[in-house]
Design a protein with these regions (language model features):
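Cysteine endopeptidase catalytic domains of the caspase/legumain-like
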Residues: 1-177
Length: 177
C-alpha cells in the first residue's frame, strides 16, 4: 500500500477494488492473498494486507478522492472459529476473528464500499463469474451520468432485494462534492 499511495499521490481519483477473503482480528481488517496459508491467528497480520493501513495512507494524501470497493467477505475462512489447515487438521481460532469485517470510517475525501454490512458475510454467486455484489456494481456503473453515491445506492437496493436482505451492502463516505 505504501508504493500505491506514493505512485497515486498526484491522481485526482484513486480507485482500489478488491475481491477475495477479508477478515478482522482484534478490530482491524485484513485482506488475504489468494495463496495465503494461515495456520494461526497471530499470522494474519504478517501474511495479509492491512485495510486500515491503506485507508490511513489514502487519507493522508492532500488532494483527490479515494474510492475503495471491497467485495471481501465471501466464505470467510475464519468464521465459525475453526478452519481446515493445509495438512487437513482442524485449527481453532479463539474469539478474535468474528465473521465479516469490522466497521471503518472513510478518511476525508474518501468512500469505502463493502459488499455487506460490518460483521456480515456476503453470499457467493456460484452460477456466475462474479459475486452478486460485483454483478450489480458492474450493471449500475454502466448508467451514464449517475452520481457515484447513487450507483452504490442502486447496488444496495439490488443486492438487498435479490437476497431478501440477507446481504445488505454498506458504505462509509466522507466525499465532499
Amino acid at each position: 500500500f505504501r508504493q500505491f499511495s506514493l505512485n497515486a499521490r498526484s491522481a485526482r481519483v484513486r480507485v482500489v477494488y478488491y475481491a477475495g477473503h477479508g477478515v478482522q482480528v482484534k478490530g482491524r481488517n485484513y485482506l488475504l492473498p489468494v495463496d495465503t496459508e494461515i495456520r494461526a491467528e497471530d499470522e494474519v497480520q504478517a501474511k495479509s494486507a492491512d485495510l486500515n493501513e491503506l485507508l490511513e495512507r489514502l487519507g493522508a494524501l492532500p488532494n483527490g478522492i479515494n474510492i475503495v470497493i471491497l467485495d471481501a467477505c465471501r466464505n470467510n475462512p475464519f468464521s465459525g472459529a475453526e478452519v481446515l489447515g493445509p495438512d487437513g487438521r482442524r485449527l481453532k481460532f479463539r474469539g478474535a476473528t468474528p465473521a465479516g469485517l469490522a466497521p471503518v470510517e472513510a478518511p476525508l475525501g474518501s468512500m469505502v464500499a463493502f459488499s455487506t454490512a460490518p460483521g456480515g458475510v456476503a453470499l457467493d454467486n456460484p452460477s456466475e463469474k462474479n459475486s452478486l455484489y460485483t454483478k450489480h456494481l458492474l450493471d449500475h456503473m454502466r448508467s451514464p451520468g449517475l452520481p457515484l453515491e447513487l450507483v452504490f445506492k442502486q447496488v444496495w437496493l439490488s443486492v438487498s432485494r435479490e437476497t431478501g436482505r440477507v446481504q445488505v451492502p454498506w458504505e462509509s463516505s466522507s466525499l465532499t462534492g
